[in-house]
C-alpha cells in the first residue's frame, strides 16, 4: 500500500493519481526490491524512477521516514492500519498491489515428530491463513 505523510502532499504536491508520484522521493524496503517497479507497472506509470531513493532494512524505519515526510513508501497495510486510521499517514491512489514475495517456514521433516514443533507449525500456518483475509499487499 502506498503511504505518505499528509504534509508532504498538501498544496501543489498532491497525489491524486498514480502518475503524481513522479518527482517524489520513493522509500524502499530492502526485502522488497522490486515492489516499486511492480507498483509502477501495475499502475501504468513507466516513467517513474523506481530505483532511486533511500533503502530501509526494517518496515518500521521506512514507516517512520514516511511519517517524517521524507518520501513515499510501499508497505503492507497491516503494518500501518493505526497510522491510517489516525490520519498520520494517507494512502492516496488507493489500489494496493500484490508483490511477488512470500514467507517460508523451512524445517527438517523429522521435526514434525516433535509435538512442540508440530504445534508451532500449525499455529504459524493458521496465522498465515488468517492474514489472507486482511489486506497485506504493498
Question: Predicted regions: what is each one?
Answer:
Residues 1-70, 75-100, 126-138:
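C-terminal regulatory
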Residues 3-6, 103-113:
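A bilobed periplasmic-binding-protein/Venus flytrap-type ligand-binding module shared by bacterial periplasmic
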Residues 33, 114-117:
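Short, structured helix-loop boundary elements
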Residues 55, 77, 108-111, 121:
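Basic side chains
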Residues 105, 116-129:
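Bilobed periplasmic-binding protein/Venus flytrap-like ligand-binding cleft at the lobe interface
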